[in-house]
């Protein structure tokens, strides 16, 4: 028994030494480097897609030169490295830390832009790619948070070089948010929950009136009113549909759940 315990203890000790050696390797190699050299090497690793190594060097730089301007930039670059390495949660945590520590930093526009990008590119699942689904099938929470980040960027920094791209992405996100609501409305119609479907359709018409989902929302609303035995409201809705979408196929044929792809009902 003593021999076994001794062997285990020795093995743990050797393992600890090996781990310590691995952890300290970069620190030892870089111990005489200036802040400029550390940052340049980290950037080289980042540009070479060696994201784990880049993050290590950024962390060493920040711990060794915490008051330098390179330390602040390293925090942002760390977030970008995590983003490129598909470490979304770590990227968001790094961005939020930077915003908390440096609320008046001149690169705050980039921090907001990067936060929006991380959330914008989230949820690219296998099924999403397989079925070629559109953005309305993404997580609405990610859509809303991405929109909020881009909106804050545009409002606070309208002259930022990132503002134009952020605005374009916001348009896509608004359409996606309308699509999120449409997916729910379709689901309720399929289930025969006509009041809930009508409420969702009204929300789209009121809050997402510049999206491509308004026409279908009116068709759903008309049918829901008919199912609820509200002929006057159904007729009013049809007039709105005729006025705004005179060539709509829903004027010839009512909305049918059978027209929807099967994956549209997934959430």
UniProtKB/Swiss-Prot annotation:
Pfam families: YfiO. It is found in: Cell outer membrane. A lipid is attached at residue 17 (S-diacylglycerol cysteine). Residues 1-16 form the signal peptide. Keywords: Cell outer membrane, Competence, Lipoprotein, Membrane, Palmitate, Signal. A lipid is attached at residue 17 (N-palmitoyl cysteine). Gene3D superfamilies: Tetratricopeptide repeat domain. One of its GO terms (biological process) is establishment of competence for transformation. PROSITE patterns: PROKAR_LIPOPROTEIN (PS51257). One of its GO terms (cellular component) is Bam protein complex. The keyword Membrane applies. The keyword Protein transport does not apply. It is a lipid-anchor. Present in outer membrane vesicle formulations which are used as vaccines in human. Belongs to the BamD family. Part of the outer membrane protein assembly complex, which is involved in assembly and insertion of beta-barrel proteins into the outer membrane. Required for efficient transformation of Neisseria meningitidis by species-related DNA. Part of the Bam complex. This is Outer membrane protein assembly factor BamD.
